[in-house]
Amino acid sequence: MRTIRVTGKGQLRLKPDITRITMTLEGVYPEYSETLQHSSEDTEALKDVLSGFGFARSDLKTLSFSIDTEYESYREREVYKQRFIGYRFQHMLKVEFSSDNERLGRILYALSNCAVSPEFRLSYTVSDPEAARNELLGKAVQDAKEKAAVLSRAAGVSLRCIESIDYSWGEIDIEYRPMERMAKAAQPLMAASYAMDIEPDDIELSDTVTVIWEIE
């Protein structure tokens, strides 16, 4: 049996319509139980802040959580040593909402001035990532079909049935990150918002699929 193998490439440009704020809470405390308690209290405080902007407490989603031992280096008689100082927690969370610069400015101002002072970064995504992935895959298959048709005509053969379709099924990152980290910015005391004027660029995606046809 003779076959032809063709790899098709799909490309897609998406206009992001969802704003994502990723926040990180951190702290170091002498006792493990104390570290857990503070991590829980800080998370609840963050939920309190966000609830003032129309978010349900369940809208704040955990991306990762860890507690690790923390050591510090010191020098003793020309020898560097380490000593245990406690436990460090790191809690990464996210919240998403339909893109709105005015709302975003108020949220970022509140985060910058709240007691727990999380580190945060801003990114953008789309409201229906699954539909985007399916459209991208469809474009890749269509590209493979068109290439196979051109090649088979040029070679004087006919395409028959598809023998196999090979696709990696890897996760496609549908996210645009204009800034990786945001720090506190100076703002007049009477203000309650940052003036945000962000127009995120389109998200460009690409993926490939390999199709094998029988030919005659």
Regions found by a protein language model. Give the residues of each.
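Short, charge-dense linear interaction motifs
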Residues: 1-216
